[in-house]
Regions:
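Active-site beta->alpha N-cap acidic-glycine motif
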Residues: 1-48, 109
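CE4/NodB-like, metal-dependent polysaccharide N-deacetylase domain
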Residues: 3-4, 82-113
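Short, well-ordered coil/turn segments that N-cap beta-strands
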Residues: 5-9, 47-52, 102-106, 128-130
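A cross-domain feature marking catalytic cores of carbohydrate-active enzymes
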Residues: 11-15, 54-58, 109-112, 134-138
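Generic structural signal for well-ordered alpha-helices
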Residues: 38-43, 87-95, 122
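Short, flexible, mixed-charge acidic loops at enzyme active sites
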Residues: 60-72
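Glycine-rich phosphate-binding "P-loop"
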Residues: 72-86
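Active-site-adjacent pocket scaffolds in enzyme catalytic domains
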Residues: 104-154
Length: 154
């Protein structure tokens, strides 16, 4: 359908998952194939003119694969990490996506829409040449503990 209308997509790819998958694949051959399939799909998309941009669910960095993923969401938001660690997460995730695209990575969408308070993560994004945010949506609200956001003023 996209080709029919010459339409292009911007896809926000969870780079933290890709990093976790790549790391876990060193101990599980099945995961090598999964990573390779995703990498091929991303290369095909970018070769076709689609755009991939940065999406981060940092809880993947605490999750492990042991006959299935053991998901640890105790550090769900970038805000749950120190400023130095946030900077390395953003840098590593951007580098992961850069491996799959010749186009610049400059936009971000927060995992779980957990962007606030923005000043706490702004410098880490800017240090990595991430200058556009795609997280906020009109009227968005979550009051869930640890996963809160309030975009009602947007």
């Amino acid at each position: 359908m996209l080709d029919k209308y010459s339409a292009k997509l911007s896809l926000f790819v969870d780079a933290a998952f890709l990093i976790a998958l790549r790391q876990a694949s060193s101990q599980n051959k099945e995961l090598v194939s999964e990573y390779d399939k995703i990498a091929k799909q991303l290369r095909n998309l970018t070769s076709a003119g689609h755009d991939i941009q940065l999406h981060i669910h940092p809880h993947w960095l605490d999750s492990v694969y042991n006959n299935g993923w053991q998901i640890d969401t105790s550090r769900y938001r970038l805000h749950d990490f120190s400023g130095e660690k946030r900077a390395s997460i953003v840098r590593d995730c951007k580098e992961e996506l850069t491996e799959h695209s010749d186009s610049p990575i400059f936009a971000y969408r927060a995992g779980g829409w957990c962007l606030q308070p923005f000043p706490e993560i702004k410098s880490q994004l800017l240090e990595n040449d991430i200058w556009l945010d795609s997280t906020v949506y009109a009227g968005g609200l979550s009051e869930e503990q640890g996963r809160h956001y309030d975009f009602r003023g947007a």
